[in-house]
Amino acid sequence: MEPLRPQITYGPIETVDNEELTEADMLSFISAAVNSTGLIGYNIKSFDDLMDNGIPQIVKQMFNVDITYKDQRDHTEIDKLRESVQIQFNFTDVNIERPQHRNYSQGNKINLLPNKARLCGLSYSGPVNLAAEVILTAHYSNGRQEVKRASIPPFQVSTFPIMRGSNRCHTHHLSKTAKKEIGEDPNEPGGYFIARGGEWVVDLLENIRFNTLHIHYHTMQQGNNEIIRGEFISQPGGAFENSSQIIIRYMTTGAITIEINSTKFSKLRIPWYLIFRMFGMTGDDSIIEQVVFDLESNSLVNTFMIEILEKSIHVLDPIFQPVQHELNREKIIQFLSEKVSKFVSNPSAYKSDENAVQYLNERQLTILDKILLPHMGQTADTRVRKLRFLGLLIHKILLVIMNVFPPTDRDSYRTKRVHGSGVSLAKAFKAIFNTSVIAPIINGFKELLKQTAFEELTQRNIIEAFSAALSKNTASDLNRSMEQSIISGNKTIMVRQRPIVNRVSTQSLERKNLLNTISALRTVNTHNTTNASKQTERADMMRRVHASYPGYICVAQSADTGEKVGMSKQLAITANVCTAGEVLSLKQRLLSDPAIQQLADVSNKDIVRKGLARVFINGEWIGCCTNAFELAQRYRMLRREGKIVHPHTTIYWDSMVDEVEFWLDVGRLTRPLLIVDNNIEKYNQACYKAAEARKKGDKDWEKHKIPFVQNTRFTSQMAKDILAGTLTLEDLVAQGICEFITPEEAENCLVAFSIIELRKHKHDVTRRFTHVDVPQAILGLAALVSPYANCTQPARVTYETNQGRQTGGWYCFSWPYRVDMNRFFQFYNEMPLVKTIAHNYVIPNGLNTIVAYMIYGGYNQEDSVIVSQSFIDRGGFAGTFYREEKVELESDIESFGKPDPLITKNLKPGANYEKLVDGFVPVGTVVKKGDIIIGKVAKIRGEKDELNKYIDRSVMYGFDEPAVVDAVMRPHGPNDEIFGLMRLRYERNLNIGDKMSSRSGNKGIAALALPTSDMPFTEDGLQPDLIVNPHSHPSRMTNGQMIETTVGLANALQGVVTDGTAFLPINVQLLSERLAQEGLRFNGCQKMFNGQTGEYFDAAIFIGPTYHQRLQKFVLDDRYAVASYGPTDALTGQPLDGKRSHGGLRLGEMEHWVLTAQGAMQTIIEKSHDDSDGCISYVCRNCGEPAIYNASHPIYKCMNCDVQADIGMVDSRRSSIVFQHEMRAANVNITSVLSPRVFQPA
């Protein structure tokens, strides 16, 4: 049988004409990639995979319960004969429906739409329906068995959170018009969850690649003699299956141990050779051969490896000393069963019973078959394959010990995976489902069998017991726990009073603008908080940009300060996350390939002596081949032609160890790259002919030579077709023009950075490229917003990625139908005169402002900016700020309404109740501080006084800034409780102290609003909107902003919009000519007049349009915090902190330094004592105990000294007094020592 070979023949690469292809045309390839997958399509796809495959697979395959317990019932003679009862049940059907909620007014269930969930504080969850089969078997002492069976029909168990936009969402496949009708943003991508009315995003989490050996040197610590360890997590399937971990350690004593981490196995470091002996390989030579492969080889590596292994076999282990030299596998298994088994409470008690010992040993082997390297098989006939694979793992560790190979690079994405919401929620679901569903069912059956005789059981009894176990409480446990796993985010949650570590990393979705929303959905977090929080070299390396990042992780975007620097990252613009592929079909194809010898047909000696390469699929060793490079290339061509393998299949040849790896597991990062073809075969043949002709003496031998040519088949016409919508990325893949490459396979590629570099080496046979890249693909969406980012200091681009997410704009198009807390809606947003490719996917969030770079009056020093008052009056950066007020009726005695002062007590003093109509201020009413905006009263139970029937619980508006009531709603909550919802609107014009930023990360603060008459102007009468300090640019190296201003000036005068995406070429000469055509200087500088004096400035001023964005840092929100009064803590009397509690700003260490340097010590005393919790305390000088003082009645008293007391007054703090009280409550007394009285002579 001949191996399958590629069939498609592509045209000669020499005939491809793409000389007209420009760098700007290459941007269309990025557009094709984004249009194909969507910016967050991978997240929705991951959740859809969980719904369609993950949850059914987990419930049906992983929760097949089979337990046997001793029967405790002894009411009758039959009960006494019954020894044990076996409970077996499995779920036969799992179905998750679209979200619903109960309509209490009609008594039925209706569809729950996303906006309804937001407004009513509901969770957007779909019903989970299960069907099951139950078998109960009674075992009697006389050998008889009695079986009871029952089929549980489908019924709702609980609900499961549904992702907005997934195939279980009501908005799935809806048209834009239909989305508008239900109050949804027609352009919103989805990808988030709605839990208890809030929007939450499940982050992408970094994880190590499963079925891969990760070798690391271990830090020598006290009491730890470990030198190096190899960690291997084995997972069959590659998506939602359970995994098992083994840790192989090499100790300073020379011992090699294996630790199996499993819930069915106690953690114990087992000598490596005992695992081989337990599986039937008893001879030391045969065991060592599994590691070194060829005992007869005389190589230095082989000899040294044998010495290490022989020494490890003879190292004394105190725990396993009784079986260290034991060759009888039954005794070894029995010894291990006594040490590590968890399924038997006292294994040593079975020693006297041979049948019990045999059962225990077989059970132990069965468990080992399932938990030891399960990806290599889980049955007894795969034990030899597992031993060979285990030997290979030890072989690789020894090579690292001998410094033949380096340890695993922990930061490389070659050995990492990125798990989306589907995998993260699957991990949480497994633990929660086991605790909240499986455990109650088992307990319910035990209780049933305890109360009812087995022979009296009916099918109805079994169904009722099954259903009763999954009652309302159980359903709420599952639903509440899944919601908590999303809301809490990576913390321990409690499920039925049991702590469960939550593996889901989430963040609240702050809708500041569309860029912020998309960036939150493309966040990749490194889940390693233990090492990240330490000041170590490892913590520093984790935060650096790794060489495997470009094209997959944005090299510019991350947090700019704090612990999240380098730990929270963003996907690059074309990067995508793969779901699991079909492994079985590819495995069958590989095993049927004649070029691959199956593992059972290859001996260890043949691998070394014949130089065979190992072949893996998802980490499973399936065989060997003679030519690894040819095998990898052949299957890559088959992938290119769309045969045999999935287009996202990873095919990687590791030349260091000569292994071919095929990967189809979940979480692989991938990105499309344009393929570069060449004529190397024709070139080699021509060179051979020329060499032969030269040998024969042919003087014209050079005519046989042909030039080497390499090029991509992507043309400018294809770029135009992509922009026209007639050509997609899938079409390019089908035509063999591009393919998907993962970080592993990228190591086998030589990628040209740009089409310019490819053309530069078009005929260079020594630099044969495999692919050509688009330079902009190394950046993420937020970094691509910055124009000419390659000309700006990288740190500034990083600042822009964070500032761009904080800018004001249109956070969504469905804002009239939403009630959001702290949302800013900017009125006027313009497309930049110098746009980038990012603006094709996000709506603009700023204005084209006329900026003059100059010093003018001293109000624009450092980061301060002078703003034209005319610009503010025209609505520059003006917008609306929204807040919400939400009040719930806590019980039946509460109601909304205007309190009647005649029968209501506890009315708020000084409050204005006159604006209330039916309990709410009408829409359009202006409310001020002291106005009651929501009226609520509670009836006093048992009150007989007709004048005090109600108590006031109304909500008073407490801000100094006036607001307009924009919307009033009275929705119903999840339990039909009524609550009032009010949206307040504020006019937020640009104020002194507000922040703004350019797209190059140059932030400024409005320091002065200058009247139009005082603003400088040009000869043409042009006045700037902003005056920016020019000294901020040389040190910050924001050259991109200078170029943007110059290009923007030419664009404004000529009425065009140009593309300023990073890495596009900048023609300085052409730009100067464009400015000259409009009568300006070549550098854009102009002569300007002083608006206050009318005189010319001595120097030409650089002025032009620059795109600026207003940051959502409003000075009006912080005014309440700068005052000498405010809310204080009821216990300590200290000022509160935070906006939610209307608290103050912290007077920190640097603020103290500033005040001290200015000699304002009294200010420090006033702020830290008088305006805080300062107070006067009284202490007895004699005993040091607190004294009693009453100012109204001059009483001075000490409980210890009585009339002998000598009481002094001390400046103290309430927090200090509270601390003393707490210490005395703990039986620890604190006394004070006061200085003695000093009497001055008269």
From Swiss-Prot:
Keywords in alphabetical order: DNA-directed RNA polymerase, Host cytoplasm, Late protein, Metal-binding, Nucleotidyltransferase, Transcription, Transferase, Viral transcription, Virion, Zinc, Zinc-finger
EC number of this enzyme = 2.7.7.6
What catalytic activity is recorded?
RNA(n) + a ribonucleoside 5'-triphosphate = RNA(n+1) + diphosphate
A GO CC term?
A: host cell cytoplasm
Where are the C4-type-classified zinc fingers?
Answer: 1180-1201
Q: Where in the cell is it found?
A: Host cytoplasm; Virion
GO molecular function terms listed in the Swiss-Prot or TrEMBL record? DNA binding; DNA-directed RNA polymerase activity; ribonucleoside binding; zinc ion binding
Quick check: keyword Metal-binding in the entry? yes
Please tell me which top-level EC class this enzyme sits in. Answer: transferase
Q: Which family does it belong to?
A: Belongs to the RNA polymerase beta chain family.
Q: Fill in the subunit field for this protein.
A: Part of the viral DNA-directed RNA polymerase that consists of 8 polII-like subunits (RPB1, RPB2, RPB3, RPB5, RPB6, RPB7, RPB9, RPB10), a capping enzyme and a termination factor.
Q: What does this protein do, in the record's words?
A: Catalytic component of the DNA-directed RNA polymerase (RNAP) that catalyzes the transcription in the cytoplasm of viral DNA into RNA using the four ribonucleoside triphosphates as substrates. Forms the polymerase active center together with RPB1. Part of the core element with the central large cleft, the clamp element that moves to open and close the cleft and the jaws that are thought to grab the incoming DNA template.
- Name recorded for this polypeptide: DNA-directed RNA polymerase RPB2 homolog
Q: What species is given as this protein's source?
A: African swine fever virus (isolate Tick/South Africa/Pretoriuskop Pr4/1996)
